[in-house]
Amino acid sequence: MFQPNFASVEWRVVSLALLLSLPNTAQADPLDKEISNLLQQRFSIAVLLSDTDAIAFGIGDFDPNALFDTANPEFGTDESINERRSKSVYVLPYTTNFDIEGSEDLHELSFKAFTIQTENDLKLFGTSKDLLKERTYGASIGYGYLYKASENVTLSTRTTTHLMRYENSFSTDNKLSSIIGRILDGRAVNVSAWAAIVQPSIKAKYTSPTSWGKWHASSTLNSFIGHSCGSANNGNIGNPKGWYLSNEITGYYNIYHGEQALFTGIKRVDLSHDLSDELGSPHYYEASIGWLFYAPKPFDWLDNFGIGVNFNYGSTLRGGSIQLYYNKQ
């Protein structure tokens, strides 16, 4: 028997179908708003998930409770690990700095390409196989200015523009689910949409060299706003907007005469409404530990590379993952 969970993706799909089946005058406004919010959130969450400084996805996911012999659901659950594994997030970022003649300040250019793919096994009716595949593709370019406020403090501002495409497809082996799919077809499922998003950010960073290496603390506020278009929901897609605040501290311990370093860090990320709806919490924490190699350098553009482990705590994506790093700052 179908047991409705009013906070679940499954129930949102069913409720959309029920609204669509009502007479036009009864369903138009609430349905348009619900689908519009759903599509808007897909672009909003893509801004966060493609920011490797805010959230980490790796080459393998695991439950930290199994590693530490604990039973804390905030570290991870079967559901949250499956949620992580249902998402394939690939981000290729590159950042380069340019000196300003006669100044310690720097110009910064950043480029990024990314793709986010999610497979939602909805099971709308008991054992039915109802698969919603979602894909978001994007490219970004940003300009930043880094101001050397003192020997230890750097203040920076950056503006990034994103161009994104979202699409989804729905398939099922169940007759009732197929009815829902036909009702929502072209409105909420089997649709595509585009968004152009502008993302300004400001950052303050304190760096302290030590006898054993260095440590730094930083605070970064990101906001974003955009415009969406496309055929989904008759063009009523909603415009993504939101913000997130990241505070972190990281330490680096030099080994092998500074050619390698061990690092550990922790961060807290606070989220705006749309993002917190997607991640199930107004904030989450991430902790990381790893090993970086500064030499040998196979490419001039590669400052360092390494491997580590990251832990997400407190969100629907809580759990552990194995990380590969390059040009980590």
Where are these regions (language model features)?
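Generic detector of solvent-exposed, compositionally biased contiguous segments
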Residues: T70-P93, E278-Y294
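Outer membrane beta-barrel transmembrane domains
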Residues: C229-Q329
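Residue-level detector of the transmembrane beta-barrel scaffold of outer-membrane proteins
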Residues: L49, A56-L67, E101-K112, T154-R158, ...
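Outer-membrane pore/translocation modules
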Residues: K33-Q40, Y94-S246, I266-S272, L279-P282
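One face of beta-strands
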Residues: S88-Y90, H107, A139, A287, ...
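Cleavable N-terminal export/targeting peptides
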Residues: M1-E74, E101-D105
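Subset of outer-membrane beta-barrel
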Residues: S36, I81-S88, L92-E101, P296-P298, ...
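Surface-exposed strand-loop-strand hairpins of Gram-negative outer-membrane beta-barrel proteins
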Residues: A56-S88, Q117-E134
